[in-house]
Amino acid sequence: MGRAIRVGLTAAGVAAFGILSGGAFAQAPAQAPAGAWMAAAPTNDAPNPYNTVEGWAKLPAGREWGSTSAVEVDKDGKSIWVGERCGTRPGPNGGPSVSTNSCWDATAGKMSDFNPVLKFDSTGKLVTSFGAGMMVFPHGIHVDRDGNIWVTDGNDNLPRRRPGQPADAPLPPAPDKVVGNQVFKFSPDGKLLLTLGKAGGNPAGPDAADPASFYQPNDVITYPNGDILVAEGHGGANSRLILFDKTGKFISQFGKKGTGLEGEFDQPHSLAFDSKGRLFVADRANNRIQILDAKTFKTLDTWYQFSRLSGIFIDRNDMIYGADSESGSVNPLHGAWKRGIRIGSAKDGKVTAFIPDPSGEGVTFSIVDGKPSLKKADGSNGPGGTLAAEGVVVDKDGIIYGAEVGPHKLQRYTKK
């Protein structure tokens, strides 16, 4: 989701700095004070200099938006790439169609026929799409310097019981082909160039014998020399960064789940580089940004003022754009902070603008009859907005795009 700025690293150089394949520095990690994020004053009052543009991106007739968290700007600086979770499918027992959060239809036991990787031109016209049957849960997306598209598939189609089902409930049918928990590199016309990880991944978490297998990879970004960095961990036991060379050969892994200030993450959800080559990690469940040395992964700074970030993007002027999709809804403990997109400086960390959730305060999200439902505190319907928006990107003209999971939208924000 984040743009990769030139930092001049090599695989050998990274290894020489002692990134350990065991996942942490030799010394014990520095611990964050308990509830450190609670001491940070909410940055809710910055001005909003943007208009919200609804319905900008057009899908083909008969297809509606499903969930999306993956959005990126093309090499041309104007076109927009999206990883979308396969729109709509027929409802159960011939009922009305339902919007989806997965390209795997567990009820029918098959993959969607829709292409999940979409490219729109600057007018919102769909110009190309690909990837049908290849991924279950497109989660993160990145465009490298050559214009290639990288997508993380953050889940799999292995049989599971739905939340709330009894332990002895029958499992859904097994798939004919296991898909998921991989990272793909495509050419701009959709040719598969490289695959990282094995299909289905490793749901048990990081395996010392197979550290290059994933479970719920969140985001991917590339270094100037072509090395590949993947952020993994979406609530399970694994929270780490995994480094590969440009051919896909595993180099090392770093980090573990925790609240510490050195080498610990809890849902490293999005990645970006600034112009100095520092690595910004949206450490979502820790309600912070961790700023790391991109060579050693040593922590340089920790910021709480951008809130609970699902998505992060840094432009060439070192302006940082952070999407908070969970405060007050998925995470009520962070309820003093408002959901939305915070904008500020990657140099000094000052927040200068805030696009609040157009759905309004007190809005909750749920699925009703297979459709996303937003409710205001008074019980009335709420409008679509940045509620559950996870991905954020900015084009060369400063237009902001937010990819939304709950409302099933790609929002556009233009200067007032």
Question: How should each PLM-predicted stretch be described?
Answer:
Residues 1-12:
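Bacterial N-terminal signal peptides that target proteins for export
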Residues 17-26:
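C-terminal segment of classical bacterial N-terminal signal peptides
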Residues 25-416:
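Sequence-structural signature of mature extracellular/luminal beta-sheet repeat domains
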